[in-house]
Amino acid sequence: MKVRHLLPALLVCATVSAQSNPRARALGVPFDGASGPLDAITDVKGVEVGDTTLIRGEGKLIVGQGPVRTGVTVIFPRGRADGEPVYAGWFSQNGNGEMTGTTWVEESGFLEGPVAITNTHSVGLVRDSIIAWLVENGRFTQQPWSLPVVAETWDGYLNDINGFHVQKADVFSALNTAKPGPVPEGNVGGGTGMVCYGFKGGDGTASRVLPADAGGYTVGVLVQCNCGRRPQLTIAGVPIGKLIPAAPANAMLEPEWKGDVGSIIIVVATDAPLLPGQLKRLARRATMGLARTGSSSGNSSGDIFLAFSTANRGANKEPGPNSVLTVSNERISPLFQATVEATEEAIVNAMVAAQTMTGVDGHTIQALPHEKLAEDMKRSPQVLPR
């Protein structure tokens, strides 16, 4: 995780959070399915993730100065050093949001270059910065243009979103530090200033590994969650949002806006050999994982999902024709199930990792309380051994 422009105390807090926060399973949340060794999108071989986190200032909002609570997260499907396209598909559950480059994903069936997630008003800057990075790194050898996929959620409750604090150097930093291995969660990258179900949200990840008789494939998910209202929050079937007591009087647990106005971006990666149409089907299943946590994808929510496969190298090789492999539709259902399960867990992991944050005008969003969550998991009759 790359953190820029931080107060020293906040830098220490953010670094410790990324390294030592427990994850949902450690608190007794009984998720379905078998995870990979990292329980992260990087369990899909080749996938690399980088981020830049911007935290500075406090007190009254001064547009252009702060407080700043934002950043950018990037995902390389085949790693930073490998720009070969991958098969991909996307789906919009509710379209009050943005994911650039998806018309070409839909048309071509390919995802080219890194995926980035940031705040709503930084999409253009991040998109242009990715192109500049590709130019600088000599990636335009096969074609003289790029249509990067950049998605967003709104962090304006905690962040000076109209101050445009994400800069080209921040995007380059996230791109240049992307790596395999554990993925930071919570108040990091594009998820720094996000709110989820009235609690602190952010970035989260999880994975599932299919049994050998189902192909042994891996499915990994990364989310940037900024959606839902507190009473909706459901974890492992338990109505957690209704069980947790009100926040202290000096804190705001539920933002002052009404309705389900947040958003969530979900990126699904797999090493299963799937065609673009099948990957669109996989992206649609992320909706069910989201629904498990309580969301109904309200009118003002931007719930947009992308799925890609790292299999089938050389599928776009010139001049062709090219031969590719594909999982039979009759055997694709376990991949659907894995996507649902990993999406649910990634959202909860984001909330468990996130820490209480105070941003513009003293707005405070409380973290999901770990002890209360663990207690409710133990006591709830809905929680069965899995």
Can you name each region flagged by the protein language model?
Residues M1-L7:
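Bacterial N-terminal signal peptides that target proteins for export
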Residues A9-A18:
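Hydrophobic h-region of N-terminal signal peptides that target proteins for export
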Residues Q19-R386:
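Alpha/propeptide regions of enzymes that mature by internal proteolysis
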